[in-house]
A protein has these predicted regions:
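Crotonase-fold acyl-CoA enzyme core
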Residues: 1-60, 94, 99, 108
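Helix-loop "lid/cap" segments that line or gate small-molecule binding pockets
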Residues: 16-17, 68, 72, 86-92
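Short, flexible turn/loop "capping" segments at secondary-structure junctions
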Residues: 26, 80-81
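Hydrophobic alpha-helical core bundles mediating ligand binding, dimerization, or RNAP-core interactions
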Residues: 51, 69, 81-88, 101
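Terminal low-complexity tails and localization/encapsulation signals of metabolic enzymes
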Residues: 102-115
Length: 115
């Protein structure tokens, strides 16, 4: 329940929680609960595309983003910002950050090392 009320407007969450109403995938998309709706036959391809997009990113950055989002989701903005800064500094000081800049300059895909 707590997660739902953080994801969608209060009145919508209350309506769903109090009535037990089921929602369609299209409604979940409208509410911002999910990122995409695809026909069942295209589900595997859509999952592969999402996974590919995430795996194309620097692993340390993905890890830091997940950690910061989990830690700061319920914090006031000022406290959240204080926790984000160390993760940003660590990511910018990584070997992968340097590789990302080099790859951009050389117009090639980066080769992430997770360091």
């Amino acid at each position: 329940m707590t997660l739902l009320q953080r994801q969608i407007p209060h009145r919508v969450a209350m309506g769903l929680l109090l009535t037990g109403q089921r929602i369609t995938a299209a409604k979940a998309l409208d509410f911002g609960l999910i990122n995409e709706v695809v026909p069942r036959a295209q589900l595997d391809a859509a999952v592969a595309r999402w996974v590919g997009q995430i795996l194309a990113c620097a692993p340390l950055s993905v890890q830091a983003i997940k950690q910061v989002v989990r830690q700061t989701g319920s914090l006031p903005p000022r406290e959240a910002q204080a926790l984000r800064l160390p993760a940003l500094v660590a990511a910018l000081q990584s070997e992968d950050s340097q590789e990302g800049v080099r790859a951009f300059q050389e117009k090639r895909k980066p080769e992430w090392k997770g360091r």
